Amino acid sequence: MQIEASPPSGNSSTIEKYDLSKKAYVLVLHHYEFKNKEHNRSGSMQDMVQIKKVLTDFRTDTLKIHSNLSLKSVQRAMDEVSTKDFSKNSCLIVFIMSHGDTKDTIMAYDGEMYSFQTDVVEKCTMNATLKGKPKIFVIQACRGDAEIQTDATRKIISDKKDIVTFQKFHKHQQSPQHYKNDLYSVI
């Protein structure tokens, strides 16, 4: 299967073609239990069951689920993604479920926040075997009251053109659990 993606008007006259004949690699960062029990996300396991159910209908090679990782463990997992060989995969799909906050940060098990842009997107886009392949992000987390910002002292050199991010809620909005009907209609 091939999918054609037209660039936004004014950017380029070429059309990107993605070869989706290979299976997708799916990574899930599922944070539902936290060191501070007040942050536990009851009901989140039902969302995970639905994600697994939906993905059985798709051509997925691997469903790699990381549950309740600390900040350092999330960073290690994403470092592995940055160097993993995805040449046998057509695309990368990343699900993130947790609490979120300002500047598109996401809460890890230990209550520490990691950056969606720096700790997740950057690690995926720097992987050479994902170049020219879709990288799809589905996030279930509140967004806080700020937009994504990058650290001006850090050089971001990876290619960001093959990314699709689904975030059901805009900044300043709460993100209720059991969003599956809306999410799955998008997928």
Residue locations for each model-derived region?
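Boundary/activation segment at the start of structured domains
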Residues: M1-F95, L130, T150, H170
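Short coil/turn segments at secondary-structure boundaries
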Residues: E38-G43, S67, M78-D79, I106-D110, ...
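Acidic, Ser/Thr-rich intrinsically disordered and amphipathic helical segments
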Residues: Q46, Q50, S73-A77, I93, ...
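Mature extracellular/periplasmic domains of secretome proteins
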Residues: V81-T83, K123-L130, R154-S158
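A short, glycine/acidic-enriched catalytic loop
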Residues: S98-K131, I148
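A short helix->loop->beta-strand "cap" motif at the edges of active sites that frequently abuts
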Residues: G132-K135, K161
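Active-site-proximal C-terminal subdomain of hydrolase catalytic domains
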Residues: Q140-I187
